[in-house]
Structures are given as structure tokens and as C-alpha cells.
A protein has these predicted regions:
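Non-catalytic beta/alpha edge segments that cap or flank active sites
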Residues: 1-199
């Protein structure tokens, strides 16, 4: 089944949305194994309308992960990480994410874990978080989403929240039309969208 077939009603990202995929893995960084999860995430984001998403591979080093998140937050609306969310001593992606985020979006992480548990009880061991990095002097912020490192886990987790991400990015940008009030295929930046406060 294709990605598009699994999520046929997912709204598209706002036009011009910039996204970044960070693969966090010592072995991938050292070119000791191929990155198979990053391409899965990239394809899903492209299908949703992300504009030429960037990809970068990082080692499991807290400081380097945090620095990369802050660097990309200067230009990207969405950063998706894959890897480093488990219980191994060097799994520090959630810690790096918490370090740079001003607000956590617990509901997204809970939704991903709930969907993962439908496939495997091992999903309970994922510590991934989601949060927002505020932009200095600029309205809105960058949404950060932590995914597991396995291709299946990353794909399942991201698909669980794909339909929520466009509305989340609209809200961060100050466009507050309720998703339930938008016509099919219309985001809240579209002329004629109904605008209300809150979510």
C-alpha cells in the first residue's frame, strides 16, 4: 500500500513549508550502515507538500543534536528526527530536543506511541518527544518531532500525526482557522478560510 493510499485525506502543508530530516545514528554518521529511515520520512514529507526537505545525519551526541536543531530552526518550520529515542546509553535525542524547545507538544508524542503500540509492545520503550523552538523576534516557531530509528517505527509514528501537522504549522504561524472549518484541500492561509481563536 502506498503512503498516499494510507493517508488519502491528509491536508497539505502551507505553501513554502521548509522541513528538515535529521537522522541520529552513530553507525550511519560513520557510514557503517545505510540510512533507511531518513528516506522514508523524506518521502512522506514530500508527499504532504514540504518544499525540498533537507536531510542531515548526526552522531548520538547531545550537543551536536541540540546545535543542529537550533541551526535548522532558523529557517525551517518543521524538523523531524529519527533515531536515538530508546533506552541505550547513547540515545539522547529526546534530551537534546527538550534542551532547545520552549514548549512541549505532548499530544503528538502520545498519539505516535499509541499508534505504535497497535503494532508492537516495544513502542512503549520509545521516549520521543515533540516540541516548539521559538524564533527570536519572529512570530511562531519551529515544530520538532522525534521518531524512532527503525524504518517501520519511523513510518508508523509519522503517519499517525501527518494529518495534524499542517494545522499545527498554521497555528504556529498565527493562522488560527480551525481545521474542522476548512474545506477539503484548503489550509487556513487560503483566502476565504474561517478564522477563530484557539484550538
Amino acid at each position: 500500500m502506498t503512503d498516499a493510499a494510507q493517508a488519502p485525506h491528509s491536508p497539505k502543508f502551507p505553501k513554502g513549508t521548509r522541513a528538515v530530516v535529521l537522522t541520529v545514528s552513530d553507525r550511519c554518521f560513520a557510514v557503517q550502515q545505510d540510512d533507511v529511515s531518513g528516506p522514508v520520512v523524506l518521502r512522506l514529507l514530500e508527499n504532504l507538500g514540504a518544499e525540498s526537505p533537507l536531510a542531515e545525519t548526526l552522531p548520538d551526541e547531545l550537543e551536536q543534536i541540540a546545535a543542529a536543531l537550533l541551526r535548522h530552526a532558523a529557517t525551517a518550520a518543521l524538523i523531524v528526527t529519527t533515531g536515538g529515542t530508546g533506552l541505550a546509553p547513547r540515545d539522547v535525542t529526546p534530551e537534546a530536543t527538550r534542551l532547545v524547545c520552549d514548549r512541549l507538544v505532548d499530544g503528538l508524542a502520545e498519539r505516535m506511541r499509541a499508534e505504535g503500540l497497535r503494532e508492537t509492545p516495544m513502542a512503549a520503550l520509545s521516549r520521543g518527544v515533540c516540541g516548539v523552538i521559538s524564533k527570536q523576534g519572529v512570530p511562531g516557531g519551529t515544530l520538532v518531532v522525534n521518531l524512532p530509528g527503525s524504518p517501520r517505527g519511523a513510518g508508523t509514528s509519522l503517519k499517525a500525526i501527518l494529518h495534524l501537522l499542517p494545522h499545527a504549522l498554521n497555528l504556529l504561524a498565527g493562522r488560527t482557522g480551525h481545521a474542522s472549518e476548512l474545506a477539503p484541500g484548503q489550509d487556513s492561509a487560503t483566502p476565504g478560510a474561517i478564522h477563530t481563536e484557539g484550538t
